[in-house]
């Protein structure tokens, strides 16, 4: 009989599969974490903004996904505790995107194993945390009594390893291994389309000449558009927003015609107290 309240193990299921209606949101969560880490690295003076990047590799045949950033990384002396924490975050919730300390758990619902690999500048060691997601599903069976609370279960599926690393390296890498095909996470075209619509990436100025005008206007109003360099595949091709100088009109293939963006106009309004109410642009 329990004498103290317990945060039960089934919370882990809620924080993984139960959090996201769309598996693609896993990409969003990891990119948010990478963006925050890059911001911290730039603020700390160990990374130039021009060199900051998030690299996504999708191996459909091998059923694996790797998302890596060259942000701050996690120092060796606090790596284990930070990666084992659940619902704990040192993010401010204002300037940083994530703040609940649960986003990284999303991948556990869509892989057989998830690895978090990280090293911080000055450390000659990298830490690898491996989460056994198959084991997690076994422990979360109603008939399984091996564990009872969320932390006991999380510890039971987690293992740590340390390996030598160049002390000048700083990064955080997420590896999703054994990703099911039916999740859609391995379809690179769908992933790129999702990221082009949701990720904090730049316009392609060659495809959309009005990009500079939009950037300049937002900066002049005090709302610069924050963008990150997100690269894909072995060739590290940049991912851009989908805007272009032309678009197709008409629903049937034979009747499709081109329409062109000739210019953009801006909308901006302030509230009665003088604070900005909204800002945007129309093509």
Describe the role of every protein-language-model region.
Residues 1-6, 41-97, 122-283:
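Interdomain "switch/hinge" adjacent to the Bergerat
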Residues 18, 22, 71, 98-102:
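Conserved aromatic-histidine-acidic binding/catalytic patches
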Residues 92-111:
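Glycine-rich phosphate-binding loop
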Residues 2-15, 19:
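P-loop NTPase nucleotide-binding/switch module
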Residues 7, 11, 23-26, 79, ...:
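Helical mechanochemical/support elements of P-loop NTPase systems and associated helical scaffolds
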Residues 20-56, 103-109:
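Conserved ATP-binding N-box helix of the HATPase_c
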Residues 113-117:
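Glycine-rich ATP-binding loops of the HATPase_c
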